Amino acid sequence: QAGCSQSRAAFLTGLYPHQNGQIGLATWKYAMFSEKIPNVVKTLGKAGYRTGNIGKLHVNPEKAFPFDFKAIPSANFSRKGMSGYAENAKKFIKSSKRPFYLQINHPDAHRPFLKTVDGLPAKPLTGRDVDALPFMGINHPELRQQSADYYNCMMRLDSYIGDLLRVLAESGKAKNTVVVYIGDHGADVMRGKRTSYEGGVRIPMIIRWPGGKSGQDRKELVSTLDLFPTFCEIAGVKPPASLPGRSLRPLVAGEST
């Protein structure tokens, strides 16, 4: 489902919303059927991984996810203290003496679409610079401005992701760490978030896997449900039998399907 909590619960449990129970926003008191449902955090924790979460979790009940490290638990829609995401990531990675799983939830893909934060992007776009996002279907000046500010958020987010990758590189652990970049749903614009149109359900999934085949642009249909079994394969543990997803390792390795 193209909603925050539903998508996050699906990613963390490897189950569809109707299977795990998180069919609405945690803000509105929707919750999973049970805190005992297997999830990424519990499974990797039992496998010896240190687990961490930076940014909002937005899934109920939160106690179902026993992270070893937590920071910046708010949604932070005002974008205050954005350097704190990379700073806390540095603290977590530096203090981790065993394999780790860290998820970082940046607010900058979310409304409000702020034109600039911390001087980023250096050259913000305006509605005169872009067309409206194609799936909107209407190229109105107001929608062009919305699209421009969404692009400004994405350019800024790109800078913040660069900060995180530098932190990882400086830790000396980059060559032994898989990095996955995803969104929880499409852009919060017309025919995007909250809908089942392509603009709502299609999201980025970029994987940097040391030893994998780089530079690929795969066309297979995959989903965030495939990440839990992928992480299980990385950790060398058996995934729960109930998971509908499959490990993405063969695709990352360049194998045909």
Task: List the predicted regions and their residue ranges.
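Formylglycine-dependent sulfatase
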Residues: 1-257
